[in-house]
Every structure is written in C-alpha cells, then in structure tokens.
Amino acid sequence: MKRDFAIAGALWLIITVIGEALVLLVEFYPAAQSDKGEEIESAFRLLLILAVPVFALVVAVLLYSVMRHSTGDTPPEDGPALHGRGLVPFIWLGVTSGLTLLIIIYPGLTSLSAVISDESNPDLVVEVTGFQWQWQFTYPQQDINIIGTPDDIPEMVLPVERSVRFEITSVDVLHSFWVPAFLMKIDAVPGMTTIISLRPTKTGTFLTDSMLRVQCAELCGLRHSTMAAHVAVVTEQEFEEWVADQQALSAGAEQPTPVTGAQEFTIVSEDSLFDVDEIQVEASGQVVMTFDNRDAAVPHNWAVYESEEAATSGGAPIAGSPIESGPVTQTIVFDAPEPGTYFFRCDVHPTTMTGVLEVR
C-alpha cells in the first residue's frame, strides 16, 4: 500500500510540475490591454495555478490505478472490502474546502468588485449605440458623433492611460459590446443603458492588432458577423488632434443656400423604410431635398449615386446627407445631374432602404 501511495504521489508531483510550468510560461490568452483586463487575466491565472494540483491528483490516481490493477481480458473476482475511512478523505476534504474558500474571497469577491466598479469621474465618456448591424460612438464632451455603415467601418478612438466610461445601449435587438483586447464584454440592451469603465494601457490600432475591435458577441440577425468596428488607442496628443480634426470636419459640412425656383421634394423614413422608392426631377436647376427621419434613435441618411454598382463598390455619392439618429429633419441642396436614372439609398441600411432618382 505504501508503495502504491509513493508511486501515485510521484506521478502526481510530475504532472503538477509540468502543468504549473505550462500555466506560468505559456500565454494561453492574448495580452490584456486595459486595467480591468489585467485584473481578469490575473484572476484566471490564479485559478489555473490552484486547479492544476487538483486536476493532476485525479489524473495521477486514475493512471496509476489503470496501470497497476489492469487484469487484461479476464478480471478476477471482487476483492475483499476495505473498511474504515483513514486520513486521506479528510485531508482531501480539507484541502479542497480551503481552496474553495480562497477562490470565493480572491479572486471571487475582490476581483469581481474591481472589474465591475464604475468610474464616477472619468476622463472620457463614450456613448455606444448598437443597431442592426453597426455601431454608433458619441463623445458628448467633445460633441463628436461617429456612425458606421456596412461600407464604412467606424473607428472608436481612445486615449491611452485615461479612464473611459462606456454607456451602452441598443435601438432594436439585443447586441453585445465586446473589445477582445480589453477582455471586457457587456450586453447592449434596448431601452436601458449598461455601463463599463476601464483604462486602456497600450497604444495600438486594428491594423496592427486585430484584437483592437468592437465586435458584437450576441447573435442579432442576418449580418451579425459584420457588426464590427475598429478601435485605436493613441497618445493624449494624438487624441486631441483627432478631436480637433473631427470637430473641424463637422463645422465645415455646410449646405449651399437654396435659390429661388429650386425643385423641392420630401422623403420620409419610418420603420426603417423610405416612403417613396422613385423620385423624378428636372435636369436643369437646383434640387432641395428634405429628408425626414422619424425613427427614434435609429441612424439614417439619404444619398444618391451614379448607379447601384457605384454605391456598393464604395463610390462617392453625387449628393447626400450626413448619418444622424432620428427624429431629425435634414435639408440636402444640390444641382440636378445630367438626365438619366440614378440610385439612392440609406447608407446604414443599404439593402432595405433604396430607390431610383429619375432625372428628365
């Protein structure tokens, strides 16, 4: 019996050493790039360190029992029963109970509270809105609004080593806000706002690290797999320059003044559909298009292209409005193009909100 314990113990020790070496030396997960991610990574590593000896003991006893007591094809009769408990079950119960208590306290209570804690006075607030099938990022302090489309993947820009508070919601179905590099994920729920706070700890962009992306992690419909956005973590100076560029871009987007006698039309979007699918205008003169987006909190725009092929291949529109969430009314002023048939659409919903512009 002592020999059995010695061999099984030696086997357990060998498996434990190998397992602990793998845990300590091999990176099983991508490196965390946020303070909360580092807390999560530390908790997982501790759980693995504590789990390896328990797992190794089960494997060692199982392997030794199979090898030691193998009888081939003809098992003997049952041996005599073993009576009494001995110390081993009590030691096993004490060790596993102690490990369980340790895990409940740390990382259970301490790490969990650190990860879910909210930053009451963050350096930056980003309002994140999910919709089928893209993301909208609003920086209320900087008056910046970025809305993605299937053909124009948005980029969320964050300053490194600054606390960021994400206020997350959805306008249609359940989505999930997940940035793999930050090791953080939370649902975007219609009608409510969920919050996570973190501090990015490393600069980088999606072009150099594919983990720096916002990915919807909740099956949300036909184009769920395409619901992604890029993330860039930059220095404080680069972030300030980006903010200035975005604000200048918004300030410079001004419509020309309509002239007397311009052709005037109105198109309405409601329930993510245009109220008309064909518009006719005269080739000469100016066109004033009023776009009325009546869908609350849903982003739309109106843009006209040379053709449907030009729109789907990334061509620039002849005219169009910026993407904005409703309810909102926009005015688009442009010179009528040459006679012909043109294609218009909502760039956010390019398969369901389309139509034809006939220029005569």
Predicted regions span which residues?
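Alpha-helical transmembrane segments of integral membrane proteins, especially early/N-terminal helices
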Residues: 4-25, 53-55, 60
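Non-transmembrane, membrane-proximal soluble domains of secreted or membrane proteins
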Residues: 2, 22-44, 66-304, 313-315, ...
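Sequence/structural segment immediately N-terminal to covalent heme-attachment motifs in c-type
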Residues: 211, 337-341
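C-terminal structural segments of small proteins and small subunits
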Residues: 342-348
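Transmembrane alpha-helical segments in integral membrane proteins
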Residues: 55-71
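Alpha-helical transmembrane segments
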Residues: 41-57
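Residue-level recognition of secondary-structure-to-loop junctions
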Residues: 200, 336-337
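Extracellular beta-strand/loop-rich beta-sandwich domains predominantly from IgSF
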Residues: 329-334
